[in-house]
Amino acid sequence: MQTAHRRIGVIGGGQLARMMVGPAAELALELTVLANDPQESAAQVAASVQLGSPDDPEAVRRLGNSVDVVTFDHEQVPPEALRALAETGCAIYPPPEALLYAQDKLAMRELLTELEIDSPRWWRIESSAQLADALKECGELVVKTVRGGYDGNGVRRVKTAREADDWLARDGVLLAEEIVFFDRELGAQVARTPQGEMRHYPTVETLQRSGRCYRVIAPAPGIPEGVDKRAREIAAAIAERIGVVGMLAVELFQVGEKVYVNELAMRPHNCGHWSMDGAVTGQFEQHLRAVAGLPLGDTAPHSRHTVMVNLLGDTRQDLRAGAALALASVPAVKLHLYGKEVKHRRKVGHVNLSGEDVGQLIDAAHRAEKLIVREGEKK
Ligand SMILES: Nc1ncnc2c1ncn2[C@@H]1O[C@H](COP(=O)(O)OP(=O)(O)OP(=O)(O)O)[C@@H](O)[C@H]1O
Ligand SMILES: [Mg+2]
């Protein structure tokens, strides 16, 4: 039997940390969240909260000194803070050497190239002239900030080099990629323990709107066996090579029978929210099991399909009124609200719906979504 860590610290107080709170209680793990503000999503519900910035080495050190293992709600923790954390001697999962590949998109592209895993064609851009040269080959490119991007922030399509001048002046270096005309986007998730045991989740179909995850279907309908196999192989190869501990998500573009890696995340991921209600072991519980050194859980889906739809801030400010309508209209829907103030297009929750018929599940999940986020929507 492995040694289990009981006291878990989470850096960041967003919705991902919040969704760890329930599973932590079930497993009798003591979760402490480091959050900026007591009103942050996870800070509202965690039994133990430390107030401080995840970017502040002192605050991170304090967290590390009070727990057995530290994990993350988001990966954008500065290197100084990670170094301070390492000095406390607590376990850090995923380890900073692995986390790098989720923090730095250039390091990630270099790693994938080394592992001979297909990526979009990519360029390291340090000057406007380099971008202009790359544009001569492709006409249009996706330019990305190397660090700090999320939900499509830090991703821009450009046709002329000038369009990236502001980012280049600020960051000095950017990643440019060819535009992949994909059939659809996929998400592959694997959980890995410190001892290297791994469990895969079914590969899912993801749909992004304005660079932001909007809908997920698990498993990806009609996925060719070869594509699913390759998605799992890629996730396993990356997890093993860099020593991930916890959940790894690999965002993929499917083009016919081929897949290209978009990016990596080393934490529970939006593409796995379906598993909270649709799989034997949800991704938040699985992440905690892995970082706590507990055996991993079964990842099998309960139903033929689960559809997850994100609730993005719209016209309704008080979501509870809409939630009551949705729960009445679609009794099978599982609702997850993040306790966040509603702002335009902000992720404020999600719904899950499991069953047999994907078309019906999609319709009903969107019905619930609209009732929750839009003022005056009728059943
Ligand atoms: N090379 C590409 N070709 C085509 N579309 C792309 C490409 N890169 C990104 N996109 C689109 O933009 C979305 C966001 O890109 P990416 O995942 O790199 O950004 P992010 O802001 O880091 O996202 P996340 O919210 O997942 O952290 C992708 O899901 C995809 O829809
Ligand atoms: Mg992404």
Regions found by a protein language model. Name each.
Residues 154-256:
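Internal nucleotide-binding/catalytic subdomain
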Residues 94-155, 161:
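A conserved helix-loop-beta module that forms one wall/lid of the active-site cleft
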Residues 4, 289-379:
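Peripheral (often C-terminal) accessory segments that flank ATP-dependent C-N-forming ligase machineries
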